[in-house]
Swiss-Prot record:
Disruption phenotype: Deletion mutant is completely O-antigen-negative. Involved in the lipopolysaccharide (LPS) O-antigen biosynthesis. Catalyzes the transfer of a formyl group to GDP-perosamine, leading to the formation of GDP-N-formylperosamine. In vitro, can also function on GDP-3-deoxyperosamine, thereby providing an enzymatic method for producing a novel trideoxysugar not found in nature. It comes from the Bacteria. This is GDP-perosamine N-formyltransferase. InterPro entries: Formyl_transf_N, Formyl_transf_N_sf. One of its GO terms (cellular component) is cytosol. One of its GO terms (molecular function) is GDP-mannose 4,6-dehydratase activity. Pathway: Bacterial outer membrane biogenesis; lipopolysaccharide biosynthesis. Homodimer. The keyword Repeat does not apply. GO terms for biological process: lipopolysaccharide biosynthetic process. Belongs to the Fmt family.
Protein backbone atom coordinates (compact mmCIF):
# COMPACT_ATOMS: atom_id res chain seq x y z
CA UNK A 1 0.00 0.00 0.00
CA UNK A 2 1.10 3.55 -0.67
CA UNK A 3 1.35 6.36 1.84
CA UNK A 4 0.10 9.91 1.27
CA UNK A 5 1.59 11.54 -1.86
CA UNK A 6 4.66 13.74 -1.37
CA UNK A 7 5.30 12.38 2.13
CA UNK A 8 8.86 13.18 3.23
CA UNK A 9 10.46 10.47 5.35
CA UNK A 10 13.69 10.69 7.32
CA UNK A 11 15.19 7.35 8.32
CA UNK A 12 17.56 7.41 11.29
CA UNK A 13 19.20 4.03 11.19
CA UNK A 14 22.10 1.64 11.00
CA UNK A 15 22.80 -1.58 9.18
CA UNK A 16 20.37 -4.02 7.60
CA UNK A 17 17.19 -2.74 9.32
CA UNK A 18 17.78 0.78 7.97
CA UNK A 19 18.61 -0.59 4.54
CA UNK A 20 15.39 -2.60 4.53
CA UNK A 21 13.42 0.45 5.65
CA UNK A 22 14.67 2.51 2.72
CA UNK A 23 13.80 -0.37 0.38
CA UNK A 24 10.31 -0.57 1.89
CA UNK A 25 9.72 3.15 1.45
CA UNK A 26 10.72 2.99 -2.21
CA UNK A 27 8.39 0.03 -2.65
CA UNK A 28 5.56 2.06 -1.09
CA UNK A 29 6.00 4.73 -3.72
CA UNK A 30 8.03 7.30 -1.79
CA UNK A 31 10.17 9.23 -4.26
CA UNK A 32 13.94 9.21 -3.85
CA UNK A 33 14.16 12.96 -3.27
CA UNK A 34 11.65 12.62 -0.43
CA UNK A 35 13.82 10.15 1.51
CA UNK A 36 16.72 11.25 3.72
CA UNK A 37 18.88 9.15 6.02
CA UNK A 38 20.75 9.92 9.21
CA UNK A 39 23.20 7.14 9.93
CA UNK A 40 26.66 6.40 11.32
CA UNK A 41 30.02 6.03 9.66
CA UNK A 42 30.54 3.22 7.21
CA UNK A 43 31.76 -0.02 8.78
CA UNK A 44 31.34 -3.74 8.16
CA UNK A 45 27.75 -3.72 9.44
CA UNK A 46 26.76 -0.42 7.83
CA UNK A 47 28.45 -0.75 4.44
CA UNK A 48 25.32 -2.10 2.73
CA UNK A 49 23.32 0.96 3.72
CA UNK A 50 26.04 3.35 2.57
CA UNK A 51 26.30 1.53 -0.76
CA UNK A 52 22.54 1.78 -1.27
CA UNK A 53 22.47 5.49 -0.44
CA UNK A 54 25.25 6.23 -2.91
CA UNK A 55 23.73 4.00 -5.60
CA UNK A 56 20.26 5.54 -5.29
CA UNK A 57 21.60 9.07 -4.75
CA UNK A 58 19.73 9.41 -1.45
CA UNK A 59 20.76 12.34 0.74
CA UNK A 60 22.31 11.35 4.07
CA UNK A 61 24.38 12.54 7.00
CA UNK A 62 26.69 10.84 9.49
CA UNK A 63 26.79 13.84 11.83
CA UNK A 64 26.49 13.14 15.56
CA UNK A 65 22.91 13.25 16.85
CA UNK A 66 23.70 16.02 19.34
CA UNK A 67 25.39 18.27 16.76
CA UNK A 68 24.01 21.35 15.07
CA UNK A 69 24.87 19.79 11.71
CA UNK A 70 22.51 16.90 12.50
CA UNK A 71 19.67 19.25 13.40
CA UNK A 72 20.21 21.43 10.33
CA UNK A 73 20.17 18.35 8.09
CA UNK A 74 16.75 17.42 9.45
CA UNK A 75 15.40 20.97 9.42
CA UNK A 76 16.46 21.51 5.81
CA UNK A 77 14.87 18.22 4.76
CA UNK A 78 11.63 19.09 6.60
CA UNK A 79 10.32 15.54 7.28
CA UNK A 80 6.71 14.50 7.67
CA UNK A 81 7.82 11.45 9.64
CA UNK A 82 10.95 10.00 11.20
CA UNK A 83 11.59 6.25 11.33
CA UNK A 84 14.34 5.03 13.66
CA UNK A 85 15.77 1.64 12.74
CA UNK A 86 18.57 0.67 15.12
CA UNK A 87 19.98 4.20 15.20
CA UNK A 88 22.64 4.06 17.89
CA UNK A 89 22.18 7.41 19.63
CA UNK A 90 19.36 9.14 21.47
CA UNK A 91 17.69 11.50 19.01
CA UNK A 92 17.16 14.95 20.59
CA UNK A 93 13.62 16.09 21.25
CA UNK A 94 13.91 19.19 19.08
CA UNK A 95 14.88 16.98 16.14
CA UNK A 96 11.87 14.70 16.70
CA UNK A 97 9.60 17.74 16.70
CA UNK A 98 10.55 18.39 13.08
CA UNK A 99 8.36 15.45 12.00
CA UNK A 100 4.82 16.67 11.40
CA UNK A 101 3.29 13.19 11.68
CA UNK A 102 5.61 12.04 14.43
CA UNK A 103 8.29 9.40 14.70
CA UNK A 104 8.56 5.68 15.36
CA UNK A 105 11.35 3.45 16.66
CA UNK A 106 11.92 -0.30 16.43
CA UNK A 107 12.97 -1.81 19.77
CA UNK A 108 13.88 -5.52 20.20
CA UNK A 109 11.73 -6.33 23.24
CA UNK A 110 8.15 -6.27 24.46
CA UNK A 111 8.16 -2.82 26.00
CA UNK A 112 8.12 -1.62 28.71
CA UNK A 113 10.26 -4.66 29.63
CA UNK A 114 13.92 -4.55 28.61
CA UNK A 115 14.22 -0.90 27.72
CA UNK A 116 17.72 0.30 26.89
CA UNK A 117 20.37 -1.81 25.18
CA UNK A 118 21.52 -5.44 25.05
CA UNK A 119 17.91 -6.51 25.51
CA UNK A 120 18.35 -9.67 23.42
CA UNK A 121 21.27 -10.83 25.57
CA UNK A 122 19.49 -10.07 28.84
CA UNK A 123 16.36 -11.93 27.75
CA UNK A 124 18.46 -15.08 27.35
CA UNK A 125 20.47 -14.52 30.54
CA UNK A 126 17.27 -14.11 32.53
CA UNK A 127 15.78 -17.30 31.12
CA UNK A 128 12.75 -15.70 29.49
CA UNK A 129 10.52 -18.01 27.46
CA UNK A 130 9.37 -15.26 25.13
CA UNK A 131 10.35 -11.85 23.90
CA UNK A 132 9.38 -9.87 20.83
CA UNK A 133 9.69 -6.47 19.28
CA UNK A 134 7.93 -3.15 19.65
CA UNK A 135 7.36 -0.31 17.24
CA UNK A 136 6.73 2.72 19.42
CA UNK A 137 6.31 6.45 19.00
CA UNK A 138 9.37 8.39 20.09
CA UNK A 139 9.78 11.00 22.79
CA UNK A 140 12.84 12.50 24.48
CA UNK A 141 13.49 9.40 26.62
CA UNK A 142 14.68 5.92 25.74
CA UNK A 143 11.90 3.53 24.69
CA UNK A 144 9.00 5.14 26.56
CA UNK A 145 6.61 6.25 23.79
CA UNK A 146 3.18 4.87 22.90
CA UNK A 147 3.13 1.47 21.19
CA UNK A 148 2.06 1.27 17.55
CA UNK A 149 2.66 -2.46 17.16
CA UNK A 150 4.09 -5.37 19.14
CA UNK A 151 4.66 -9.00 18.28
CA UNK A 152 5.64 -11.86 20.59
CA UNK A 153 8.41 -14.32 19.72
CA UNK A 154 9.26 -17.54 21.56
CA UNK A 155 12.77 -17.91 22.95
CA UNK A 156 14.10 -21.40 22.21
CA UNK A 157 16.32 -23.29 24.64
CA UNK A 158 19.11 -23.32 22.05
CA UNK A 159 18.80 -19.68 21.00
CA UNK A 160 21.88 -17.51 21.00
CA UNK A 161 21.77 -13.72 20.94
CA UNK A 162 22.83 -14.05 17.31
CA UNK A 163 19.94 -16.31 16.27
CA UNK A 164 17.30 -14.51 18.33
CA UNK A 165 18.36 -11.07 17.10
CA UNK A 166 18.11 -12.12 13.47
CA UNK A 167 14.75 -13.82 14.01
CA UNK A 168 13.44 -10.61 15.58
CA UNK A 169 14.71 -8.53 12.67
CA UNK A 170 13.18 -10.85 10.08
CA UNK A 171 9.79 -10.77 11.80
CA UNK A 172 9.90 -7.02 12.44
CA UNK A 173 10.67 -6.24 8.82
CA UNK A 174 7.53 -8.12 7.76
CA UNK A 175 5.47 -5.66 9.83
CA UNK A 176 7.28 -2.47 8.83
CA UNK A 177 4.93 -1.39 6.04
CA UNK A 178 1.98 -1.77 8.41
CA UNK A 179 3.71 0.46 10.95
CA UNK A 180 4.55 3.13 8.38
CA UNK A 181 0.88 3.27 7.39
CA UNK A 182 -0.14 3.63 11.04
CA UNK A 183 2.22 6.58 11.40
CA UNK A 184 1.03 8.11 8.15
CA UNK A 185 -2.61 7.82 9.24
CA UNK A 186 -2.00 9.42 12.63
CA UNK A 187 -2.51 6.33 14.80
CA UNK A 188 -1.70 7.54 18.35
CA UNK A 189 -0.80 4.06 19.60
CA UNK A 190 -1.43 2.81 23.13
CA UNK A 191 0.36 3.41 26.41
CA UNK A 192 3.02 0.95 27.54
CA UNK A 193 1.55 -1.34 30.17
CA UNK A 194 3.21 -3.64 32.68
CA UNK A 195 6.41 -3.63 34.69
CA UNK A 196 9.25 -1.65 33.15
CA UNK A 197 12.91 -2.66 33.22
CA UNK A 198 16.02 -1.01 31.84
CA UNK A 199 19.47 -2.30 30.89
CA UNK A 200 22.49 -0.10 30.20
CA UNK A 201 24.90 -0.35 27.27
CA UNK A 202 27.61 -2.13 29.27
CA UNK A 203 28.37 -5.73 28.31
CA UNK A 204 26.54 -8.02 30.78
CA UNK A 205 28.94 -9.03 33.56
CA UNK A 206 31.78 -7.74 31.41
CA UNK A 207 31.34 -10.79 29.18
CA UNK A 208 33.01 -12.98 31.82
CA UNK A 209 31.65 -16.31 33.10
CA UNK A 210 31.44 -16.76 36.86
CA UNK A 211 32.24 -20.46 37.53
CA UNK A 212 30.11 -20.24 40.70
CA UNK A 213 26.97 -19.96 38.58
CA UNK A 214 24.91 -23.07 37.95
CA UNK A 215 25.46 -24.84 34.65
CA UNK A 216 22.04 -23.63 33.48
CA UNK A 217 23.07 -20.02 34.17
CA UNK A 218 26.41 -20.53 32.47
CA UNK A 219 24.76 -22.04 29.39
CA UNK A 220 22.39 -19.08 29.14
CA UNK A 221 25.23 -16.62 29.53
CA UNK A 222 27.36 -18.31 26.87
CA UNK A 223 24.45 -18.25 24.43
CA UNK A 224 23.71 -14.62 25.30
CA UNK A 225 27.30 -13.64 24.53
CA UNK A 226 27.42 -15.45 21.19
CA UNK A 227 27.19 -12.78 18.50
CA UNK A 228 29.94 -13.07 15.87
CA UNK A 229 32.15 -11.36 14.89
CA UNK A 230 32.31 -10.15 18.51
CA UNK A 231 34.24 -12.29 21.02
CA UNK A 232 32.21 -14.95 22.84
CA UNK A 233 31.95 -15.36 26.59
CA UNK A 234 35.24 -15.41 28.47
CA UNK A 235 36.39 -17.77 31.22
CA UNK A 236 39.26 -16.57 33.42
CA UNK A 237 41.07 -19.12 35.57
CA UNK A 238 44.53 -18.84 37.16
CA UNK A 239 45.44 -15.84 35.04
CA UNK A 240 44.51 -17.55 31.79
CA UNK A 241 41.74 -16.40 29.46
CA UNK A 242 39.60 -18.89 27.54
CA UNK A 243 37.04 -18.00 24.87
CA UNK A 244 33.88 -20.05 25.27
CA UNK A 245 31.40 -20.07 22.36
CA UNK A 246 29.34 -23.04 23.60
CA UNK A 247 28.47 -24.98 26.73
CA UNK A 248 30.21 -28.05 25.29
CA UNK A 249 33.48 -26.15 25.04
CA UNK A 250 32.97 -24.88 28.59
CA UNK A 251 32.55 -28.45 29.85
CA UNK A 252 35.60 -29.58 27.93
CA UNK A 253 37.67 -26.74 29.36
CA UNK A 254 36.55 -27.46 32.91
CA UNK A 255 37.45 -31.14 32.55
CA UNK A 256 40.94 -30.16 31.46
CA UNK A 257 41.57 -27.54 34.15
CA UNK A 258 43.05 -28.88 37.42
CA UNK A 259 40.77 -28.31 40.41
Amino acid sequence: MAIAPNTRVLVAGYGLPAEFCVTTLIGMGVEIDKIAVATHREDNRNCGLHSMLRLRNIQFTTAAANSEEFYEFGANFDPDMIISMHYRSLIPGRFLKLAKKGSVNLHPSLLPAYRGTNSVAWVIINGESETGFSYHRMDENFDTGAILLQERISVEETDTAFSLFHRQIARAMLRLEEVILKLDQGDPGFAQLGEASYYARELPFGGVIDPRWSEVQIDRFIRAMFFPPFPPAVLKIDGKVYYVPSIDIYRSLMRGIPS
